[in-house]
């Protein structure tokens, strides 16, 4: 019974543990085992690993060996593939996979066989990242099955294009192992061609061909079924079946045509201007068209950019010009908008199409300067029929598919708010051409109608009743009612379809000035309140017009709402404008000469000449569209006239656009004799040759009518070019008779431009621009129909129609670009940032790079300042940016301190030459915003670079949203605080911004609403500042990939697995303890019988089969009586039972375990 005693004396806690462990679910046991296996495996896979090739001809070939746990071993070749070879070649820096021999060509390896059934995708960074059976596991491989590879670093490989007429087109041939071979055309596409053209430095791929288009080759066929993504550095880096593996013959040899080897050109035909018309492409010596299938604004933008025209505004599907003929070279063109040439966009193969010439594509290119959008016939600029003028062609918009989204875009573009409705039937019929504009749709959030996609200009008809008409929310049609003379009366404004009056407290002198101008009533004379012109009826508009006075229409003025019911018709406002709106010349031989007559108070009368001078006459001639004043003859030359002689005296300066703009006095003027009436002779339609009044070689040209005040020559002979970015390019302007004016582009050509460039000392003309290429001018259009022979020394020595004689508008202002015109830019294909990139200068009509020899920080500062970027920058190393290759213009630029522009810095002579990217200058200018005098780079006083100097920001309205924009712009973390009152000291210089009101999501501070630049009443004691979170990004250096893995990841994995296993064992321990506690509670709450049963079962569970056999074989049935209570102490230690209970348990046990 000693064995039984051992059972009774055993700690029942360990018995609990064994019982619960045995009763664990299969899932729990599986998890424990898997984690244990992972723990063991990770200790193996996490060690450092290395890769090498052994016994090969060179470092890029041989038997594959892997080092694991400091022991080198081989790889079995079961399932060995080219994908695995590619991974190994890339890993070892031999990127070109040649072949995957089934067994090593060299002698067999020795030691462990570490890997078997290796399965790679080809893009893994290391061989052990591929799937395999497990370290050291293999299918009874021997070292006769050791895997090997043959790679190459590409140095012994060559490629060429043959039979194409040049080195950039032809049949593809590759030299491998000393033999030239071809490429099969199976699955060959534009991606393959792109790799080849880039590899051969032949530009971009234009086309590819198969079926031995360039003749059949000879020798091996090296590649078949290539798979390229288009960005590989060499063709042999694309996926392939292996060198020399194919199922082709030379009838399937592939070829390519690259851009540098193609005879490619693009032109526009049959357009209104040189930048509009049908598109035609020259390919392989023949011109053909482009089908309009899928043609949209992205395609048009690429075409316009390629042609050197402004941004594409219209993408014409069917043009007004005649149909093309010949080839249709391209179809289904699909551009993203950034491609440098139309043939670099996706398209069908050259010559493959499903079109006819009724579907020829075209474009109209424009930067918007020659486009005009307006609403006509609706009573104000914000309502009416939609009219579009594109490059002198006037058209209407067809309302097929026209809705509120399209109308919203028009209203927004015109500054007229949002669309109220899209039809207003009482508009007057404004005549337009039969040219119609069609839009497929707008999404409603475009900034202009030109931004809507899929324009179609012309080619289709639209009925007159289909013309698009809209009314915008800012539509306010003004009128003057109840006045006793023209241009006076009660102010009434029409909103929508309703007329209403304005309260006299809501209409300022500035608003009245705008009203008079819009009604063509000259200037405001007075504002009269208190219903001076009678009380109106109906609506009184509860809004205040907040005009500045320079607006052309009342609808352009901001409006502030006013509470309803605070005004009555007894306070209707009235306005009196200048009365001198009707004026004429009478008794002259032409409409542009004669006696001056005004209509005042409904009656015509002559004007007294007591204060009439040439400046007044200039304004009158311009108002009558008669050019400029040539003379102001006296002595009633054109008759005395009948009726009233008005004694009003005009005080014009000569620069006004309208006689009503000139100050007028009449009070106290003396009576005027009938022979003292004002007269004028305007230049009108007279044709003459004009010269400088100050020229010593040419005296003033005598007029045909010798009057004492005649002017027939330019007063000072001044000439300038405006808005061109330099003194040698821009809009041509001439100073004549006290005002600057422009030249019309009719007949404007290089001969005229040559004279301008020579006169200004700007070399020769390289471009004579028209259509207000440099923006619309103001003032007179002095000259038209210029006919220079190119030898004149002054532009006004050329023949023309004469001063002011023209039929033009400022949309036709002429301009020039001279050879000495220079411009500057930083450009980068990878970024649109204008303040970083390759330094380029424009000279003699072309862009070129700048060499970095002698380039200094001082020179970089000059460049950055000239570009308005910052006051300094840094020189970057040669960029990998794939910027277009262009020649170098200049080198050795050495700027001393002081120059404002790069043009003032000495350098080597201009010399156009080819240069390598390493010789070019790459610059990054500093940020236009900075923080000063703070403890870190992300806190301090806010300063902005603008207008060539650093300045501060006033703290009026400055808050955390403004600070957030600054922090984001500087690359710092979120804003912590927005400081006021010069927290980081007072700055110097201008205070550039005030009343900044950011939302917090703007990309830069100058995108936030604020007062105009430099308009501030603040002092530097109000300088704004910020405190941003200071983000310090520390880059962890990466270990070079040489076949060795990092130990760090292995340690981490082992640690995690250990923690998981520990957690599982702790959970089992607490589970056991908790169950024992429940059992104690159960025993104490039950009766004695239950206690006896539980104890019996617990004892029984601790006895194995041998114990039971021993007890059953006992011959002395009374041995059990020898057990004493003392021998059961170990039981009572775990179950609190009495002595009687112990005896009962013993007796019960004897009865159950044998018939003693």
Swiss-Prot record:
Induction: Induced by anti-inflammatory mediators such as glucocorticoids, interleukin-6/IL6 and interleukin-10/IL10; suppressed by pro-inflammatory mediators like bacterial lipopolysaccharides (LPS), IFNG/IFN-gamma and TNF. The record marks 269-270, 281-282, 333-334, 360-361 as: Cleavage. Residues 42-1050 are extracellular. GO terms for biological process: acute-phase response. Its main location: membrane. InterPro entries: SRCR (IPR001190), SRCR-like_dom_sf (IPR036772). It is a single-pass type I membrane protein. Changing residue 1072 to A: Impaired phosphorylation by PRKCA. A soluble form (sCD163) is produced by proteolytic shedding which can be induced by lipopolysaccharide, phorbol ester and Fc region of immunoglobulin gamma. This cleavage is dependent on protein kinase C and tyrosine kinases and can be blocked by protease inhibitors. The shedding is inhibited by the tissue inhibitor of metalloproteinase TIMP3, and thus probably induced by membrane-bound metalloproteinases ADAMs. Phosphorylated. Keywords: Acute phase, Cell membrane, Disulfide bond, Glycoprotein, Inflammatory response, Membrane, Phosphoprotein, Repeat, Secreted, Signal, Transmembrane, Transmembrane helix. Residues 1072-1156 are cytoplasmic. SMART domains: SR. Interacts with CSNK2B. Intravenous lipopolysaccharide (LPS) produces a rapid rise of sCD163 in plasma of patient as it induces metalloproteinase-mediated shedding from monocytes surface. Long-term LPS infusion finally increases expression of the membrane-bound form on circulating monocytes. The soluble form (sCD163) in plasma is a novel parameter in diseases affecting macrophage function and monocyte/macrophage load in the body. The concentration of sCD163 is probably reflecting the number of macrophages of the 'alternative macrophage activation' phenotype with a high CD163 expression playing a major role in dampening the inflammatory response and scavenging components of damaged cells. This has initiated a number of clinical studies for evaluation of sCD163 as a disease marker in inflammatory conditions e.g. This is Scavenger receptor cysteine-rich type 1 protein M130. The gene is CD163.
């Amino acid at each position: 019974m000693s064995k039984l005693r051992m059972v009774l004396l055993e700690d029942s806690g360990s018995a609990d543990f064994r019982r619960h462990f045995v009763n664990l679910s299969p899932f729990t046991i599986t998890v424990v085992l898997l984690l244990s296996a992972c723990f063991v495996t990770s200790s193996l896979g996490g060690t450092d690993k290395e890769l090498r090739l052994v016994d090969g001809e060179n470092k890029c070939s041989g038997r594959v060996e892997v080092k694991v746990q400091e022991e080198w071993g081989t790889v079995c070749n079961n399932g060995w593939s080219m994908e695995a070879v590619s991974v190994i070649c890339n890993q070892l820096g031999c990127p070109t996979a040649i072949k995957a021999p089934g067994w090593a060509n060299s002698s067999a390896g020795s030691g462990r066989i570490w890997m078997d059934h290796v399965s790679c995708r080809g893009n893994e960074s290391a061989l052990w990242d591929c799937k395999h059976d497990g370290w050291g596991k293999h299918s009874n491989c021997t070292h006769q099955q050791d895997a090997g590879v043959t790679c190459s670093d590409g140095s012994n490989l060559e490629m060429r294009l043959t039979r194409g007429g040049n080195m950039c087109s032809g049949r593809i041939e590759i030299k491998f192992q000393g033999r030239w071979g071809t490429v099969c055309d199976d699955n060959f596409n534009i991606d393959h061609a792109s790799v080849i053209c880039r590899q051969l430095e032949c530009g971009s791929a234009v086309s590819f061909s198969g079926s031995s288009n360039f003749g059949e080759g000879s020798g091996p066929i090296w590649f078949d079924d290539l798979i390229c993504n288009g960005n590989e550095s060499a063709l042999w880096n694309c996926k392939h079946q292996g060198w020399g593996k194919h199922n082709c013959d030379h009838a399937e040899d592939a070829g390519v045509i690259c851009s540098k080897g193609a005879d490619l050109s693009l032109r526009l035909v049959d357009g209104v201007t040189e930048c509009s018309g049908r598109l035609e492409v020259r390919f392989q010596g023949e011109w053909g068209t482009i089908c309009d299938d899928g043609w949209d604004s992205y395609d048009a933008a690429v075409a316009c950019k390629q042609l050197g025209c402004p941004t594409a505004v219209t993408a014409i599907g069917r043009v007004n010009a005649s149909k093309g003929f010949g080839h249709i070279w391209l179809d289904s063109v699909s551009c993203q908008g950034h491609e440098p040439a139309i043939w670099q966009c996706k398209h069908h193969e050259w010559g493959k199409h499903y079109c006819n010439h009724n579907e020829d594509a075209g474009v109209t290119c424009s930067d918007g300067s020659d486009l005009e959008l307006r609403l006509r016939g609706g009573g104000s600029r914000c309502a009416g029929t939609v009219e579009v003028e594109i490059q002198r062609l006037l058209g209407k918009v067809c309302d097929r598919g026209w809705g509120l989204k399209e109308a919203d875009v028009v209203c927004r573009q015109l500054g007229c708010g949002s669309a109220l409705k899209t039809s207003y039937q009482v508009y007057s019929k404004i005549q337009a051409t039969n040219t119609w504009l069609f839009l497929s749709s707008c999404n409603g959030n475009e900034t202009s109608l030109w931004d809507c996609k899929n324009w179609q200009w012309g080619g289709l008809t639209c009925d007159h009743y289909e013309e698009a008409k809209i009314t915008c929310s800012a539509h306010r049609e003004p009128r003057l009612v109840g006045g006793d003379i023209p241009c006076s009366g009660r102010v009434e404004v029409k909103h929508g379809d309703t007329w209403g009056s304005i309260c006299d407290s809501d209409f300022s002198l500035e608003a009245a000035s705008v009203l008079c101008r819009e009604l063509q009533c000259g200037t405001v004379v007075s504002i009269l309140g208190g219903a001076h012109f009678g009380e109106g009826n109906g609506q009184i508009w509860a809004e205040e017009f907040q005009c500045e006075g320079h607006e052309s229409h009342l609808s352009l003025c901001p409006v502030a709402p006013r509470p309803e019911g605070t005004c009555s018709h007894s306070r209707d406002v009235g306005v009196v404008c200048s009365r001198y709106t009707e004026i004429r010349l009478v008794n002259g031989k032409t409409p542009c000469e004669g006696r001056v007559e005004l209509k005042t108070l409904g009656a015509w009368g002559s004007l007294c000449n007591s204060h009439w001078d040439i400046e007044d006459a200039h304004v009158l001639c311009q108002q009558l569209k008669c050019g400029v004043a040539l003379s102001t003859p006296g002595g009633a030359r054109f008759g005395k006239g009948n009726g009233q002689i008005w004694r009003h005296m005009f005080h014009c300066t000569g620069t006004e656009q309208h006689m009503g703009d000139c100050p007028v006095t009449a009070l106290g003027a003396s009576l005027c004799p009938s022979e003292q009436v004002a007269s004028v002779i305007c230049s009108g339609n007279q044709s003459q040759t004009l010269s400088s009044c100050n020229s010593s070689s040419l005296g003033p040209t005598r007029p045909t009518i010798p009057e004492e005040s005649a002017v027939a020559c330019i007063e000072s002979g001044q000439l300038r070019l405006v808005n061109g970015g330099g003194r040698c390019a821009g809009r041509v302007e001439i100073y004549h008779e006290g005002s600057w004016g422009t030249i019309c582009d009719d007949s404007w050509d290089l001969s005229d431009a040559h004279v301008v460039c020579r006169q200004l000392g700007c070399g020769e003309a390289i471009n004579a621009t028209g259509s207000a290429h440099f923006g619309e001018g103001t003032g007179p259009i002095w000259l038209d129909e210029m006919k220079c022979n190119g030898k004149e020394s002054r532009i006004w020595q050329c023949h023309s129609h004469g001063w002011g004689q023209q039929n033009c508008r400022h949309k036709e202002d002429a301009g020039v670009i001279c050879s000495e015109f220079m411009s500057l830019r930083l450009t980068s294909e990878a970024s649109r940032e204008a303040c970083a990139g390759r330094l380029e200068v424009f000279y003699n009509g072309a862009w070129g790079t700048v060499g970095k020899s002698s380039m200094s920080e001082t020179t970089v500062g000059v460049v950055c300042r000239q570009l308005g970027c910052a006051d300094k920058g840094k020189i970057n190393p040669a960029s990998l940016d794939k910027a277009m290759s262009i020649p170098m213009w200049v080198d050795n630029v050495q700027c001393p301190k002081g120059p404002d522009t790069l043009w003032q810095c000495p350098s080597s002579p201009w010399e156009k030459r080819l240069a390598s990217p390493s010789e070019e200058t790459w610059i990054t200018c500093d940020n236009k915003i900075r923080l000063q005098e703070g403890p870190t780079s992300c806190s301090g006083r806010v300063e902005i670079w603008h207008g060539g100097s650093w300045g501060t920001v006033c703290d009026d309205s400055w808050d955390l949203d403004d600070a957030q924009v600054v922090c984001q712009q500087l690359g710092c973390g979120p804003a912590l605080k927005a400081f006021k009152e010069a927290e980081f000291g007072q700055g110097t210089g201008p205070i550039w911004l005030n009343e900044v009101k950011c939302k917090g999501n703007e990309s830069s501070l100058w995108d936030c609403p604020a007062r105009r630049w430099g308009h501030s009443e603040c002092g530097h004691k109000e300088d704004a500042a910020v405190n941003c979170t200071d983000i310090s990004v520390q880059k962890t250096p990466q270990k070079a990939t040489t076949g060795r893995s990092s130990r760090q990841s292995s340690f981490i994995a082992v640690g995690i697995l250990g923690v998981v296993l520990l957690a599982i064992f702790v959970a089992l321990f607490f589970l056991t303890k908790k169950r024992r506690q429940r059992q104690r509670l159960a025993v104490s709450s039950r009766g004695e019988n239950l206690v006896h049963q539980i104890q019996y079962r617990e004892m029984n569970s601790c006895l194995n089969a041998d114990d039971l056999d021993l007890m059953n074989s006992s011959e002395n049935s009374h041995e059990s009586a020898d057990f004493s209570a003392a021998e059961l102490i170990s039981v009572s230690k775990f179950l609190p039972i009495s002595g009687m209970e112990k005896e009962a348990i013993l007796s019960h046990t004897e009865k159950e375990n044998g018939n003693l």
